[in-house]
From Swiss-Prot:
Protein name: Transmembrane protein 102
Key word Translocase present: no
Transmembrane segments: 261-278
Complex and partners: Interacts with CSF2RB; this interaction occurs preferentially in the absence of CSF2.
Matches recorded under Gene3D superfamilies: 1.10.1410.40
């Protein structure tokens, strides 16, 4: 039977080759071929994905259960910690841009040399309805003014040791909105500890690693090491010092006289309580092992070693937060993906550590739940481009005060507002999007500020290290293909469990 013919080729034959586009697919700045960059970005995405690694599900689930059990033991030691909390778990640590904490010292940790994968866990201490807040209209911070009672709980008495003086002259700036929101979070009950964690009757004195800050160097024991896996050298500037307690005024029903909840003291209490529990743990065979805990810029970083080969080191940034119902006045209510605020809208207050913070009592506004919902609406090629740019940026910002990782995440949202969705969704444009994000970041570092995505009229600041980072970024931008190849090779080594090779002699 004769075959049908389209032109001069049978219909079952191969399609004609696509026309070559070498003259239009070259990066003007570096001369790199965009097609090669896109292929490297896709390969990096495959290598950095833990979903295809050896037994990742069991490792991650055990580690998550271990952390939740640890928080349950914290509640047993100090009832102020909520017995049941609606936790929000984010992939990526704070040093990878999961949250905005300003340009604060975040410790010496670097993904690869010190840990294989990072996560951020927001732990609400309690919830407010927004009437207790006093927003600073010129910044991204707020004061939490505590009344005598919240939902029948003597909240002021409970947090007596973390209170500061009232803040005069501020006003309440929270209101509720009527639009809709769709965001999902992780819920976990932490009232019953799992079998992965057991506790001694009395704390055990643990030997400190000589390469870490000893207990005598920090009055609040801001670094605790329970093993010798990673020789993390923590300089004194990398560790948040204990805040000086402020005098507490006598209780008064006038809101202007309500004492404020000091974020620095809450962060210090959170770490001290968690460290006391961590020092009293009994290792359980087959369970993750907590080997390091330290406090940085208002949050606590813990490192867990997985029990089975290939052994991995997981980083969890635990941050005590206050959950606030409502929506801040002047905040964005819609995005390219739809409404952000609804009748059930809420946001968080986190203990920020930036130098622009008005005082030690101030809390930074955080929209992690909304960002989680936005991320689900970002086209996959753009997410790949962002992950690649983040991987290239990682060695440049390790150990610095630069806020570049979260600035890069914010540029991701602005790109979705500015560029056509069809362009961002095309896989072949991942290389161009990655270069575009790096170029935009360079312009932000040069300008020193970036408009806040959620808070209209507010600015994110780049930090004191932006000038040095700008020079490093320019050198990287001159040969992005080489930087991507190096990132792919590092990801391959880490995927095989090589990220821990030679760290602390391989002991976990």
């Amino acid at each position: 039977m004769a075959s049908a013919v389209w032109g001069s080729a049978p219909w079952w034959g191969p399609p004609p080759p696509a026309p070559a586009r070498p003259l239009t697919d070259i990066d003007f700045c570096s001369g790199a071929q965009l097609q090669e960059l896109t292929q490297l970005i896709q390969e990096l995405g495959v290598q950095e994905s833990w979903s295809d690694g050896p037994k990742p599900g069991a490792d991650l689930l055990r580690a998550k259960d271990f952390v939740f059990s640890l928080l349950g033991l914290v509640h047993r030691r100090d009832p102020r910690f909520p017995p049941q909390a609606e936790l929000l778990l984010l992939r990526g640590g704070i040093r990878e841009g999961s949250l905005d904490l300003g340009h604060a010292p975040l410790g010496p940790y670097a993904r690869g040399p010190h840990y294989d994968a990072g996560f951020t866990l927001l732990v609400p201490m309690f919830s407010l309805d927004g009437t207790e807040l006093q927003l600073d209209l010129e910044s991204c911070y707020a004061q939490v003014c505590l009344p005598e009672m919240v939902c029948g709980t003597p909240i002021r008495e409970m947090w007596q040791d973390c209170l500061g003086p009232p803040v005069p002259g501020a006003r309440d700036s929270i209101h509720r909105t009527e639009s809709e929101e769709s965001s999902k979070d992780w819920q976990s009950s932490v009232d019953q500890p799992h079998s992965y964690v057991t506790e001694h009757e009395a704390p055990v004195s643990l030997e400190k690693s000589p390469s870490d800050v000893s207990a005598s160097e920090s009055p609040q024991h801001d670094v605790v090491d329970l093993g010798s896996t990673a020789p993390l050298k923590t300089m004194s500037s990398d560790v948040t010092k204990a805040a000086v307690e402020s005098p507490v005024p006598k209780p008064s029903e006038a809101r202007e006289a309500w004492p404020t909840l000091c974020s620095a003291q809450v962060a210090a209490w959170f770490f001290a309580t968690l460290a006391a529990v961590a020092e009293s743990l009994i290792p359980v065979p087959g369970a993750p092992r907590l080997v390091h805990a330290a406090r940085h810029a208002g949050f606590t970083t813990v490192l867990l070693a997985t029990p089975e080969p290939p052994r991995r080191l997981l980083l969890f940034d635990l941050i005590p937060v206050v959950s606030v119902a409502g929506w801040p006045e002047g905040a964005r209510s819609h995005s390219w993906a739809g409404p952000l605020a609804s009748e059930s809208a809420s946001f968080y207050l986190v203990p920020g550590g930036g130098t622009e913070r008005p005082c030690a009592s101030a809390w930074q506004l955080c929209f992690a739940r909304q960002e989680l919902a936005l991320k689900a609406r970002i086209p996959a090629p753009l997410l790949q481009a962002h992950a690649a740019a983040q991987a290239l940026l990682r060695p440049l910002v390790a150990g610095t005060r630069a806020a570049a990782p979260y600035l890069l995440r914010t540029l991701l949202y602005w790109a979705c507002e500015r560029l056509p969705a069809l362009y961002l969704a095309r896989p072949e444009n991942a290389g161009a999007c990655c270069l575009g994000l790096l170029d935009e970041l360079g312009r932000v570092l040069e300008a020193g500020t970036l408009p806040h995505y959620f808070l209209n009229g507010r600015q994110l600041r780049t930090g004191d290290d932006s000038a040095a980072l700008l020079g490093e970024l320019a050198r990287l931008r001159g040969d992005p293909a080489r930087a991507l190849r190096a990132a792919v090779e590092e990801a391959k080594v880490a995927r095989k469990g090589g990220g821990l090779a030679g760290v602390g002699g391989g002991a976990h």
